[in-house]
Amino acid sequence: MALAAIPQETRTNIMSTPKVLVLRAPGTNCDQETGFAFEQAGAKATYAHINQLLDEPQLAAEHQIMCFPGGFSYGDDIAAGRILASQMQSRLADTLNEFRDAGKLVLGICNGFQILIKSGFLLPMDDQGMQATLTWNNCGCYLARWVDLKTNNSKCVFLKDVDHMYLPIAHAEGKFVTRNDAVLSSLKENDQLALKYCSSPTGNDCGPTNPNGSVADVAGVCDETGRIFGLMPHPERNIDPTHHPRWTREDVGPRGDGFKIFENAVSFFG
């Protein structure tokens, strides 16, 4: 079933069309639907292989939003997101820092979250290394299911006016862990633990509330500015009511829960 076009009324506060750079690498497999979600929210998507950005770093400056979508970049060899994260550290650090310092937005979904974490771009590294990482689920296997999520009074731009979401997950290395309790406490105090797994408000949990064992039930984290956000669930897989697994039996609203994330990103530049 084709998705309905976004009513013009939802775009009345957008004075210009922000451009989103959707990056991919070998193994990325969610770039098209993620770009589509941004375009449904009013953005213009540009799809680029990571090598294109390496060759043309000025490409980043031509966009207002940068997105690292889901998939298995470089086959998740070594560890999920590790190779692309290393490329970012060694060859794109200046480009990414300039993008951030210009007040722009960065979104990492699933593998993209793993990339942002392991590159140190989301949570900067210090003299002890990474503050946090994403590692193997407690079950030791790949998980694909729907989860309930709640926001955490965060400063995150992408979660403005969002309280609860129902989104799918699909990952093997989605367990968020911090280096120590001090890092976790600091992230809490700074309102950076933006999104958490929670129980279903209807009591219809289809599995453990926290599917992967993440510390403090963390499903998504933002940086100190609230403009860089990474999450393990896939918002692009629930932007239309027909994406909901119970859309024929329940009133799921005019839009899928994930759509608000993309709408907030676009509206930020309105």
PLM region descriptions:
Residues A4, Q52, Q58, L96-E98, ...:
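Amide-donor transfer/coupling interface in amidating biosynthetic enzymes
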Residues M1-I109, F113-P124, G129, T135-L143, ...:
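N-terminal beta1-alpha1 cap of cysteine-dependent amidohydrolase-like domains
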